[in-house]
Design a protein with these regions (language model features):
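N-terminal Rossmann-like NAD(P) cofactor-binding subdomain of oxidoreductases
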Residues: 1-183, 218-220, 284-285, 289-295, ...
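Charged docking surfaces used in two-component/phosphorelay signaling
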Residues: 66, 155-329
Length: 329
């Protein structure tokens, strides 16, 4: 099977190649794609070197699957061109997520919605993925009424230039800024651009995407997204109000038995999720599970995941694996 990785030199693209190496997708030909300035350069994959090609050359090869991590404008322009030659596109950008004709997929939750007719499949936002991995099983059991989420997001979510800014500031240098302010020793309540209603695009994604993935628009959700000077992964403080009463031990049991979720909830031994220890892992980690003492039927918890892996690359590869396993490609 021929697989194109579009945006192969970016942070997510590099992790994508690593995840593809680790997993069992039956790749016979890898087609790395990047910007024109990178064409002709090499990337390593399974101890071999592959030459980066242009978008047009990749389309001409007619790969079975193309995984995009190259930004929304690139996806809007080129994903349909791949689809025209029969390629299934799995897109990491926000370009197609809320398009009513496109599926927004977290495989553990809703891969069953995919069909052979789906030629452009949207990969959700990184912070959305880890959130719905926890919300979905609890919604099935207790029926969610309202969610309040505050995020603490890694600079890796912005890209390599943001990581370089943080590392330079740690050294006491004065680098070119990706963010409007210093990120070292700071926290910026400003993930992505602000919309007319004063929410950021990141917050709007968090408020809209879960409902589409979970197939449930009956609950309300509000979000505040904050960029923090860490590199390991994204963290989320989540407050969930349910329609039905819950039992804390049952909540822990449900989450511990949810595929792709690891329970870390032993505060007596200082055992709880942290972004530093999520780095390089594919699971979503959940802990600090406790009742909200201010109102009934309400739960507080803390969710952490590697935003480059389950939040992006791993989820996309899992979609590809599902397509192959179910003869949808």
């Amino acid at each position: 099977m021929k697989v194109a990785v579009v945006g192969a030199t970016g942070m997510v693209g590099q992790v994508m190649l690593r995840v593809l190496e680790e997993r069992n997708l039956p790749i016979t030909e890898l087609i790395p794609v990047a910007s024109e300035r990178s064409v002709g350069n090499k990337v390593k994959f399974k101890d071999k070197e592959f030459t980066i090609v242009s978008m047009d050359d990749a389309i001409a090869v007619k790969p079975e699957i193309a995984i995009f991590s190259a930004g929304g404008n690139t996806s809007l322009e080129f994903a349909p061109k791949f689809a025209e030659v029969g390629t299934v596109v799995i897109d990491n950008s926000s370009a197609w997520r809320m398009d009513p004709t496109k599926k927004l997929v977290v495989p553990e939750i809703n891969a069953n919605v995919l069909t052979k007719e789906d030629k452009i499949i949207a990969n959700p936002n990184c912070s959305t993925i880890q959130l719905v991995m926890v919300l979905h099983p609890l919604n099935i059991k207790y029926d969610i009424k309202r969610v309040v989420v505050s995020t603490y997001q890694s600079v890796t979510g912005t890209g390599k230039a943001a990581v370089d800014q943080l590392n330079s500031e740690i050294k006491g240098e004065n680098p070119e800024k990706v963010y409007p302010y210093q990120i070292f020793k700071n926290a910026l309540p400003h993930c992505d651009v602000f919309s007319d209603d004063d929410y950021t695009k990141e917050e709007i994604k968090l408020m809209k995407e879960p409902k589409k993935i979970m197939g449930d628009d009956t609950f309300n959700l509000t979000a505040t997204a904050v960029r923090v000077p860490v590199q390991g992964g994204h963290s989320e403080s989540v407050n969930i109000e349910f329609e039905n009463e819950f039992d804390l031990e049952e909540v822990r049991n449900i989450l511990s038995e949810t595929p792709g979720v690891t329970l870390q909830d032993d505060v007596k031994n200082n055992h709880y999720p942290m972004p530093l220890y999520s780095e390089g892992k594919d699971d979503v980690f959940v802990g600090r599970i406790r009742r909200d003492l201010s109102q009934p039927k309400t739960l507080n918890l803390w969710i952490v995941a590697d935003n480059l892996r389950k939040g992006a690359a791993t989820n996309a590869v899992q979609i590809a694996e599902y397509l192959v396993a179910n003869n949808l490609v």
